[in-house]
């Protein structure tokens, strides 16, 4: 997986919000735990082994450091990156679609005889990272993304563009690079178009062709 960019300042705002929440939680936890921790400290003063530990370093202070704001922030951000951003109400605010899943459908390319072929697109996504892996059973090849960017049009349409490199298992087949643009028709339907620098004898030029596809996400995609 690789990082992807977003054409609005939402990530910076998320960081600020999570950090403020972390400070608040840290203050509350320190306040709630201060009395029992002081009580425990008094109790263990008479225990020889624990007295030695207390001489080496203040164990209780170390425990309080563990629940400090930076540690809480790291935990919350990890949780947000993996799970929270996909929750319905949070995602409505973020406006970044959750594309995780297996998408299948048909694609058509200007390469060769403009034949239609089967396409499967596997998308893995967190709040920070994403990957697109497209496989084409009819042609025995696979494309993998290497960069991506979300952008929202002025009319509210959500799109994502990603660069890719295509590799084939056939020795005689060439490797080539290209770019995809996906448009979300609905939560479980996407339409895409692409272009690449693959040699295209049909056009009588050294390289370049384009295509389009329509994919639907499986029932267990999310």
Kindly give the residue locations of the regions a language model identified:
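Amphipathic/hydrophobic helical signal segments and adjacent flexible N-terminal regions
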Residues: 1-98, 109-110, 214-222
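Central antiparallel beta-sheet cores of small beta-barrel/beta-sandwich binding domains
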Residues: 86-222
